[in-house]
Design a protein with these regions (language model features):
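N-terminal Rossmann-like NAD(P)+-binding domain of SDR-like oxidoreductases, especially those catalyzing
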Residues: 1-194, 354, 363
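Amphipathic terminal alpha-helices
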Residues: 1-11, 323-363
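Residues in well-ordered alpha-helical elements
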Residues: 74-75, 87, 99, 106, ...
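NAD(P)-dependent short-chain dehydrogenase/reductase
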Residues: 144-149, 153, 161-162, 167-254, ...
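Conserved C-terminal active-site "lid" loop/helix of NAD(P)H-dependent oxidoreductases
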Residues: 236, 259-260, 296-317, 339
């Protein structure tokens, strides 16, 4: 069967999906998307990491089974996964912040590395799982500050504990795939590496877009640590569409799909932080501006891009929204939230705008 780059609602209708990290920013968006397509979703995660949170503001819990638990607790995770009896597993639970990893390196490694081991061990015992996607990050690569994008076969590395732990998670996933998941009767295992994800509903600390929104709401200049740092920015729905497409491919053609995959933006959307800040301030209006934070900062990479040629050719996946469109959507989303709009309905409308004609309401 040929692999299509489209997310197929008919495929997901009725599928049993186990999703870790469902209370986070990306996990909440993915939970809503899966619910809208008629999947039976069981989520496993810690309580929402921020107040406010997208999970609560969009009433994500209403359409799924939500289990509050810690992936560092192997027995609890295993019981939850086996009880859910999933056909598809998507592993997104993580300690996701570079700066937080400097404060708690032990917790970061325990969550991002051993949490992945615990998840894959549970999948080994779950007879009904046919596809599993382990989500890591673009920062898993050994960053050499190259001007070109990293490909999936580049060396794993990572300067800081977060990035390094995600490189380790990639190595764990590769070892488990080769050691335990070969053969037609086994689950097909893949890993997915996404760029810097942005979108409405992100209130995390020490992340660019939430920091910008917090500052402009207060009428204060945005403090920017590294204005010339270049990242592969993408709207949150872009990589999520990649994960869903990858799971479909794992189901239909595991020999091709059981591998590592990059999901990033077009080359022209790898922009410096200053470019993002200036356009967000312009879109917000009200004389919003920025200034450089001159305090001493921990190390962060200056230049990072992803090569998505493999996903284009092998999965027929492609980015849909430009960076400009993504930034505009964030400002509109945030203004709607501030105005008291129903964010559950608004998020569903956002999903339809992103998916366009491909999106079909589940019966």
């Amino acid at each position: 069967m040929s692999i299509s780059g489209d997310v197929d609602p008919a495929f997901w209708a009725g599928k049993r999906v186990f999703l870790t990290g469902h209370t986070g920013f990306k996990g909440s968006w993915l939970s809503l998307w899966l619910q809208k397509m008629g999947a039976h979703v069981t989520g496993f995660a810690l309580t929402p990491p921020t107040t406010p949170s997208l999970f609560e503001e969009a009433r994500v819990v209403g359409g799924m089974t939500s289990i509050i638990g810690d992936i560092r607790d192997r027995e609890v995770l295993e019981r939850a996964l086996l009880a859910a009896d999933p056909e598809i597993v998507i592993h997104m639970a993580a300690q996701p912040l570079v700066r937080a990893s400097y404060d708690d390196p032990v917790g970061t490694y325990a969550t991002n590395v051993m949490g992945t081991v615990h998840l894959l061990e549970a999948v080994r015992k779950a007879c009904g799982v046919r596809a599993a996607c382990v989500v890591t990050t673009d920062k898993c690569y050994e960053n050499r500050e190259w001007a070109w994008g990293y490909r999936e076969d580049e060396a794993m590395g990572g300067y800081d504990p977060y990035s390094n732990s995600k490189g380790c998670a990639e190595l764990v996933t590769s070892a488990y795939r080769r050691s335990f998941f070969g053969g037609a009767s086994k689950a097909a295992i893949a890993s997915a590496r996404a760029g810097n994800v942005i979108g409405g509903g992100d209130w995390a600390a020490d992340r660019l877009i939430p920091d910008i929104l917090r500052a402009v709401e207060k009428g204060e200049p945005v403090l920017i640590r590294n204005p010339l740092a270049i990242r592969p920015w993408q709207h949150v729905l872009e990589p999520l569409s990649g994960y869903l497409t990858l799971c479909q491919a794992l189901w239909h053609d595991p020999a091709v799909a059981a591998d590592a995959w990059n999901f990033g933006p077009r080359d022209e959307d790898a922009q410096p932080v200053q470019w993002i800040v200036e356009r967000m301030c312009e879109a917000w209006g009200d004389s919003a501006g920025w200034t450089r934070d001159e305090s001493v900062q921990p190390h962060e990479a200056h230049y990072l891009k992803l090569d998505i040629s493999k996903a284009r050719a092998g999965l027929h996946w492609r980015p849909r929204w430009s960076l400009g469109t993504a930034l505009e959507s964030i400002v509109v989303w945030h203004r709607a939230w501030r105005a008291g709009d129903d964010m559950h309905d608004y998020c569903h409308s956002e999903l339809e705008r992103f998916a366009g004609a491909r999106f079909v309401h589940a019966a």
